[in-house]
């Protein structure tokens, strides 16, 4: 069984189609690995033992269905996405006990494609965090070193893939929450273009920033999942009517990187970047050049304002989105409130964690009448200038490359008392959310000092995931093979 969990999604699906492996065997292999690794990793908030096995047995009885691109493949879903009949908490006590009666669109599409859900992944509360230490339930650890963080907010999704508990996981990315844990956990993480994947059924953090994407072991695996979950959805007003491409087929169109121009922004390769991350990412860029790519310097001069801009906008949107959670219908409710206003106030105060409360307070402040122009309006203006920066940069290159994070995974608890340093972990990822363009993290090496995974980030123009995935796929095939699963 243990050999099965080392397979990629693409490999296990091929084995399922030829009946070399049954869906039940694939699910059992993942559930056994969950039982073995979960006491230390703590990647999952809910495990679907009986439901997954029952579904697998029913699918085996009917036989493989080649029309379903994920038939029989065990997957994990971030707990920010609604799952019919499976608890969904967004990592918060205020949603404790909440079980949706419907599936989010992304989850529904996975099910239609034949995927089997084996668990719900832990996350920072309401996706507010970079380490998964802000979960109200448990702290997820990095499968490569349990003393270190897995990244966040989709840390559970990254850890569950790296620990061999599933073949793919869905994460959400508001400011780097897919790409950061992908970098820290040594897996592939893709943040699609804003609007590429429906947000219907996702518990929102920052509605103009959030996007759902895959976390997998290989680029081809990520392309397969993106093929399934992407596309227009009438139930999401922000869903784009952009035609979907076959990203898996597109991977075979490019055998090398000749004709590809990669932009290297000086703002992402200098101050604050650790030596081991810089060396690993520069070595990967050198390999890309060997494969025919041309590199050119590009300027993203508004980067210095990106952190402040992002947190003003994200916190403002969070303060609005989280106003709906009051403890009345589900989750934590304060005891013996004297009046309705006290029920709301005390329930929210008791159930929201410190980081969530901090962001609600700041968000309310920047939206207040006296400070709206000074903060929120100015941030919106900077956001527009940042988009112009990227558009201009892409006039001279096809994709942009940078480290996904300034460092490798750091020890648990190291930054919890310093919110500003924690926020700086997102410095290379947040700009893409502000401009709505796609990005991904590709594992390229293990750091020489920490021996932890290093991710290289690729960024592309809006709706050009194809070029980004092609470049990552070619580079992945030509870099020294890295271990995909920590057993």
Curated annotation (Swiss-Prot):
Active site: 78 (charge relay system), 153 (charge relay system), 177 (acyl-ester intermediate)
Signal peptide: none
Domain of life: Bacteria
One Gene Ontology cellular component annotation held by this UniProt entry: glutamyl-tRNA(Gln) amidotransferase complex
A biological-process GO annotation: translation
Keyword Protein biosynthesis recorded: yes
E.C. number: 6.3.5.7
Compositional bias (Polar residues): 135-144
Enzyme class, UniProt record, top EC level: ligase
UniProt GO MF annotations: ATP binding; glutaminyl-tRNA synthase (glutamine-hydrolyzing) activity
PROSITE patterns registered for this protein in UniProt: AMIDASES
Nucleotide-binding found in the keyword field: yes
Annotated stretches, region: Disordered: 135-155
Catalytic activity: L-glutamyl-tRNA(Gln) + L-glutamine + ATP + H2O = L-glutaminyl-tRNA(Gln) + L-glutamate + ADP + phosphate + H(+)
Gene3D superfamilies: Amidase signature (AS) domain
Subunit structure: Heterotrimer of A, B and C subunits.
Record-linked PANTHER family: GLUTAMYL-TRNA(GLN) AMIDOTRANSFERASE SUBUNIT A (PTHR11895:SF151), TRANSAMIDASE (PTHR11895)
NCBIfam families per UniProt: gatA (TIGR00132)
Protein family according to the UniProt entry: Belongs to the amidase family. GatA subfamily.
Stated role: Allows the formation of correctly charged Gln-tRNA(Gln) through the transamidation of misacylated Glu-tRNA(Gln) in organisms which lack glutaminyl-tRNA synthetase. The reaction takes place in the presence of glutamine and ATP through an activated gamma-phospho-Glu-tRNA(Gln).
Name of the protein described by the UniProt record: Glutamyl-tRNA(Gln) amidotransferase subunit A
Upper taxonomic lineage: Bacteria, Pseudomonadati, Thermodesulfobacteriota, Desulfovibrionia, Desulfovibrionales
């Amino acid at each position: 069984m243990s050999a099965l969990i080392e397979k990629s999604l693409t490999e296990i699906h091929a084995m399922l189609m030829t009946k070399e492996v049954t869906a039940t065997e694939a699910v059992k292999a993942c559930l056994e690995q969950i039982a073995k690794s979960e006491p230390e990793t703590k990647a999952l908030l809910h495990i679907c033992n009986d439901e997954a096995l029952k579904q697998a047995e029913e699918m085996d009885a009917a036989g493989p269905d080649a029309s379903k691109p994920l038939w029989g493949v065990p997957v994990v879903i971030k707990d920010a996405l609604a799952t019919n009949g499976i608890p969904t908490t967004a990592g918060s006590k205020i949603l404790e006990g909440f079980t949706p009666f419907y599936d989010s669109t992304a989850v529904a599409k996975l099910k239609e494609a034949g995927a089997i859900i084996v668990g719900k992944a832990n996350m920072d509360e309401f996706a507010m965090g970079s380490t998964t230490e802000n979960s109200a339930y448990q702290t997820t650890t990095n499968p490569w070193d349990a003393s270190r963080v897995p990244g966040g907010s989709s840390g559970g999704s990254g850890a569950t893939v790296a620990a061999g508990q599933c073949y793919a996981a869905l994460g959400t990315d508001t400011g780097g929450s897919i790409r950061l844990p992908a970098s820290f956990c040594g897996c592939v993480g893709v943040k699609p273009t804003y609007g590429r994947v429906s947000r219907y059924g996702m518990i929102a953090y920052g509605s103009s920033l959030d996007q759902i994407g895959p976390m997998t072991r290989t680029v081809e695996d990520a392309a397969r999942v993106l093929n399934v979950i992407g596309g227009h959805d009438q139930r999401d007003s922000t869903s784009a009517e952009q035609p979907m491409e076959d990203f898996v087929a597109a991977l075979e169109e490019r055998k090398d990187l000749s004709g590809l121009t990669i932009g290297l922004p000086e703002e992402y390769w200098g101050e604050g970047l650790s030596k081991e991350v810089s060396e690993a990412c520069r070595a990967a860029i050198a390999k890309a050049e060997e494969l025919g790519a041309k590199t050119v310097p590009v300027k993203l001069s508004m980067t210095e304002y990106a952190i402040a801009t992002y947190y003003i906008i994200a916190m403002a949107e969070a303060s609005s989105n989280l106003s709906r959670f009051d403890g009345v219908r589900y989750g934590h409710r304060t005891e013996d409130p004297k009046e309705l206003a006290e029920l709301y106030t005390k329930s929210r105060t008791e159930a929201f964690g410190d980081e969530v409360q901090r962001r609600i307070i700041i968000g309310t402040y920047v939206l207040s009448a006296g400070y709206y122009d000074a903060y929120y309006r100015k941030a919106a203006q900077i956001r527009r200038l940042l988009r112009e920066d990227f558009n201009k940069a892409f006039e001279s290159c096809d994709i942009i490359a940078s480290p996904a994070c300034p460092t490798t995974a750091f020890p648990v608890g190291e930054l919890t008392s310093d919110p500003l340093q924690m926020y700086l972990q997102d410095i290379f990822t947040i700009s893409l959310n502000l401009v709505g363009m796609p990005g991904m993290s590709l594992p390229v090496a293990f750091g020489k000092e920490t021996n932890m995974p290093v991710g290289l980030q690729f960024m592309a123009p809006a709706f050009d995931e194809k070029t980004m995935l092609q470049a990552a796929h070619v580079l992945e095939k030509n870099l020294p093979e890295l271990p995909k699963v920590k057993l």
